[in-house]
């Protein structure tokens, strides 16, 4: 069994050390006039959309979406995914951004301002990035290692079955690359919203998009004849990816595909993590929230679809249909084998892919650290640079511990959903599979039944803006989202088995 399992690669231990300081001695959750600082923000809609899309587009778009598409009927999964993205995903994303902008605060204080008795939901939301940050840099470090591999011409070595396992079980290497990635992330957050997050997102996101389009086009041109004389082409792989497959489809199977699509949307859009609330608090009042949400959705979904066009044809050409069932190991095990099979261009293709993956991981990791930083600045009334430095040191140490979870601190932990994982997988399970669906369900109840959908709708329509889907939003937030989240929570925790 691979030492990496589950949703490990969704960039994506509860560091409860923060919480005693929040409650101890009655430290206020709201800024006092004495400590209130001018809140920086995005310069405009483009900067916000690029930063938010950078958060949404992560490593999960690059491996999990293609894997689920291959597993769940190709075009059938894609169709269901698109429908849910522009209904279910639209509702959650709109809610988070509107909450952030209307309150002008980060998750802890935002929920408290909505309803004082619901501040516990803000604290739960804050804990999600606190947990995710414990392992995010570790995964980013893995990607950074593969960039170094292809830069130094070691692509053939990376194609060996044991290469990835040997790397993550090597204490020195895995810890070093995790710390390096943590430092890259911290530098961007250290420079603030406009000069850090927005500036780098405006550069990295377009470059990443161009690279993924180029690699996807390259994948279409591939052709390979295996040892049995069977010739497969990239265009045939594209047909496998896009053609709906109804083979073996039952009602139970359809429900599983629906849940897979919903979980991918849920994790991909960075909702119910406090990230979009934090980014929303940086958005100016003249920015059109409705238009921004659709732009973020189009960008995120477009990258996911392009990732499928890039990965599935490539794997199909060299390994056939069977190669697409690799799951989490696809990115670090299967693809290096494919790159090694490419005459002359394998090194360039491998380097381009992992640089693109590093951009996706970096922009997502930045959003996680920024959310923690922004909340800590409000809680402890500290300056950005000092807060960032303290958090960087703290998470660098924690990242080393998590990285060593495959060597010195190796353990096999049974998870409630029936899988076996290591320390990193446990952190990923608690944050992604347990807390995020639960938080999203509670947030929908708060908006739909406590403050009312109009609380969000009024913010979206601020300044006379149009909100054509307001009726859909009201129905989704009150009735559909709470039920979907409850079912997803039961499934992800192993209570509901399909």
Residue ranges and their predicted role:
Residues 15-63, 92-97, 101-113, 119-120, ...:
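Membrane-interface "cap" regions at the ends of multi-pass membrane proteins
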Residues 68-72, 98, 113-114, 120-129, ...:
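Membrane-water interface regions at transmembrane-helix termini and the short interhelical loops
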Residues 121-124, 373, 380-392, 428-485:
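C-terminal membrane-solvent junction of multi-pass transporters and transport-like membrane proteins
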């Amino acid at each position: 069994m691979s030492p990496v399992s589950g949703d490990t690669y969704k960039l994506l231990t509860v560091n409860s050390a923060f919480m005693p300081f929040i409650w101890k001695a009655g430290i206020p959750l709201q800024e006092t006039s004495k400590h209130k600082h001018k809140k920086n923000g995005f310069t405009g809609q483009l900067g916000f959309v690029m930063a938010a899309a950078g958060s949404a587009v992560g490593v999960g778009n690059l491996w999990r979406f293609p894997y689920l598409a291959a597993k769940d009927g190709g075009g059938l999964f894609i169709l269901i995914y698109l429908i849910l993205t522009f209904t279910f995903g639209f509702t959650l994303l709109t809610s988070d951004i509107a909450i952030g902008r209307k309150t002008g605060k980060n998750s802890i204080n935002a929920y408290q301002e909505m309803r004082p008795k619901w501040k516990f939901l803000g604290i739960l939301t804050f804990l999600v990035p606190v947990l995710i940050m414990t392992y995010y840099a570790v995964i980013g470090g893995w990607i950074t290692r593969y960039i170094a591999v292809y830069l130094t011409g070691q692509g053939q070595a990376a194609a060996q079955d044991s290469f990835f396992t040997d790397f993550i079980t090597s204490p020195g290497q895995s810890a070093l690359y995790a710390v390096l990635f943590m430092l890259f992330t911290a530098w961007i957050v250290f420079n603030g919203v406009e000069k850090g997050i927005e500036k780098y997102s405006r550069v990295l996101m377009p470059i990443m998009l161009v690279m993924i389009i180029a690699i996807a086009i390259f994948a279409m041109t591939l052709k390979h004849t295996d040892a049995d004389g069977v010739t497969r082409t990239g265009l045939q792989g594209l047909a496998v990816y896009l053609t709906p497959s109804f083979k073996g489809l039952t009602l139970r199977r359809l429900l599983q595909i629906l849940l897979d699509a919903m979980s991918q949307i849920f994790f991909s859009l960075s909702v119910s993590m406090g990230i979009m609330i934090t980014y929303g608090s940086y958005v100016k009042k003249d920015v059109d929230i409705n238009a921004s949400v659709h732009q973020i959705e189009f960008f995120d979904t477009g990258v996911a679809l392009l990732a499928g066009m890039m990965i599935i044809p490539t794997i199909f050409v060299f390994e056939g249909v069977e190669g697409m069932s690799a799951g989490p190991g696809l990115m670090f095990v299967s693809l290096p084998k494919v790159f090694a099979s490419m005459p002359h261009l394998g090194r360039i293709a491998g380097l381009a892919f992992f640089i693109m993956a590093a951009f996706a991981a970096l922009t997502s990791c930045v959003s996680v650290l920024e959310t923690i930083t922004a909340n800590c600045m409000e809680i402890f009334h500290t300056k950005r640079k000092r807060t960032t430095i303290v958090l960087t040191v703290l998470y660098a140490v924690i990242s080393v511990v998590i990285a060593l979870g495959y060597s010195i601190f190796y353990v096999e932990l049974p998870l409630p959903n029936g899988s076996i994982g290591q320390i990193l997988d446990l952190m990923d399970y608690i944050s992604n599979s347990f807390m995020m669906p639960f938080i999203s369900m509670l947030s929908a109840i708060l908006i739909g039944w406590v403050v009312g959908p109009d609380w969000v709708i009024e913010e979206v329509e601020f300044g006379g803006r149009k909100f054509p889907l307001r009726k859909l939003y009201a129905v989704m937030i009150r009735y559909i989202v709470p039920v979907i989240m409850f079912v997803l929570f039961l499934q992800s925790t192993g209570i509901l088995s399909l």
